[in-house]
């Protein structure tokens, strides 16, 4: 028996396997599972294929802290980390359990918001599980920090050594074009519908002017009078 396996009993391994399966369903990468679950790599590879039905993807983990400073990513990252911090500090959840529950709640909130607003439901949430996990690690390592907005009092993600002494969150100082891309797809669909209606109206006007009637709908056949 290996040293890693000897440190866990069967009950501990079963619990770690359940946590790993939950993380895989949320989109965890294999590197993340190896660090958080402390299970043999071969076991995690088999578990990933069993849960997802495909082989685990390869590639480097995201390592940029600047990504979290863009306005949309910062809002989502701040929302997730507030949930995570509540589960850790107030609810007393262990780190791995808090990570799973926090991301699940964040994803549910994000899906509910996208259904309530005219947003593109086919697009993924800005903050995937890997970036959420890296956010927790960055904050724990002191690379990123939590600040309080001087206007609304909300806690948000910022640089550890930010130059602003009185920071303001992104929600209180949204950029001018914030949200334009989010509603672009519904707007394009509405524009296409308006264009089609204008074309149908032109067809009807031409039909009346030429002394003919239009039947069978907007794109129906013309019958001379």
UniProtKB/Swiss-Prot annotation:
<keyword id="KW-0963">Cytoplasm</keyword>
<dbReference type="GO" id="GO:0008270">
    <property type="term" value="F:zinc ion binding"/>
</dbReference>
<dbReference type="GO" id="GO:1902208">
    <property type="term" value="P:regulation of bacterial-type flagellum assembly"/>
</dbReference>
<comment type="function">
    <text>Functions in complex with FlhD as a master transcriptional regulator that regulates transcription of several flagellar and non-flagellar operons by binding to their promoter region. Activates expression of class 2 flagellar genes, including fliA, which is a flagellum-specific sigma factor that turns on the class 3 genes. Also regulates genes whose products function in a variety of physiological pathways.</text>
</comment>
<keyword id="KW-1005">Bacterial flagellum biogenesis</keyword>
<comment type="subunit">
    <text>Heterohexamer composed of two FlhC and four FlhD subunits. Each FlhC binds a FlhD dimer, forming a heterotrimer, and a hexamer assembles by dimerization of two heterotrimers.</text>
</comment>
<keyword id="KW-0238">DNA-binding</keyword>
<keyword id="KW-0479">Metal-binding</keyword>
<keyword id="KW-0804">Transcription</keyword>
<feature type="binding site">
    <location>
        <position position="152"/>
    </location>
    <ligand>
        <name>Zn(2+)</name>
    </ligand>
</feature>
<dbReference type="GO" id="GO:0005737">
    <property type="term" value="C:cytoplasm"/>
</dbReference>
<protein>
    <recommendedName>
        <fullName>Flagellar transcriptional regulator FlhC</fullName>
    </recommendedName>
</protein>
<dbReference type="GO" id="GO:0003677">
    <property type="term" value="F:DNA binding"/>
</dbReference>
<keyword id="KW-0805">Transcription regulation</keyword>
<comment type="similarity">
    <text>Belongs to the FlhC family.</text>
</comment>
<dbReference type="GO" id="GO:0044781">
    <property type="term" value="P:bacterial-type flagellum organization"/>
</dbReference>
<dbReference type="GO" id="GO:0045893">
    <property type="term" value="P:positive regulation of DNA-templated transcription"/>
</dbReference>
<dbReference type="InterPro" id="IPR007944">
    <property type="entry name" value="FlhC"/>
</dbReference>
<dbReference type="Pfam" id="PF05280">
    <property type="entry name" value="FlhC"/>
</dbReference>
<keyword id="KW-0010">Activator</keyword>
<feature type="binding site">
    <location>
        <position position="169"/>
    </location>
    <ligand>
        <name>Zn(2+)</name>
    </ligand>
</feature>
<keyword id="KW-0862">Zinc</keyword>
<feature type="binding site">
    <location>
        <position position="172"/>
    </location>
    <ligand>
        <name>Zn(2+)</name>
    </ligand>
</feature>
<feature type="binding site">
    <location>
        <position position="149"/>
    </location>
    <ligand>
        <name>Zn(2+)</name>
    </ligand>
</feature>
């Amino acid at each position: 028996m290996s040293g890693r396996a000897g440190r866990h009993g069967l009950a501990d391994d079963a619990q770690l396997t359940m946590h790993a399966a939950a993380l895989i369903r949320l989109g965890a990468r294999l590197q993340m599972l190896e660090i958080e679950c402390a299970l043999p790599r071969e076991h995690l590879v088999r578990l990933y294929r069993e849960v997802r039905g495909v082989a685990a993807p390869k590639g480097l983990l995201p390592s940029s802290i600047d990504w979290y400073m863009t306005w949309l990513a910062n809002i989502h990252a701040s929302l997730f980390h507030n949930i995570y911090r509540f589960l850790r500090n107030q609810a007393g959840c262990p780190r791995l359990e808090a990570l799973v529950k926090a991301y699940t709640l964040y994803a549910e909130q994000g899906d509910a918001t996208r259904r309530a607003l005219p947003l593109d439901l086919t697009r993924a949430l800005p903050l995937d599980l890997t970036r959420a996990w890296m956010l927790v690690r960055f904050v724990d390592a002191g690379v990123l920090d939590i600040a309080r907005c001087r206007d609304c009092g909300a806690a948000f993600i910022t640089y550890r050594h930010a130059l602003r002494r009185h920071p303001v969150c992104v929600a209180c100082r949204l950029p001018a074009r914030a949200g334009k891309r989010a509603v672009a797809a519904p707007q394009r669909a509405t524009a296409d519908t308006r264009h089609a209606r204008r074309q149908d109206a032109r067809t009807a006007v031409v039909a009346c002017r030429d002394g003919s009637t239009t039947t069978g709908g907007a794109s129906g056949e013309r019958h001379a009078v």
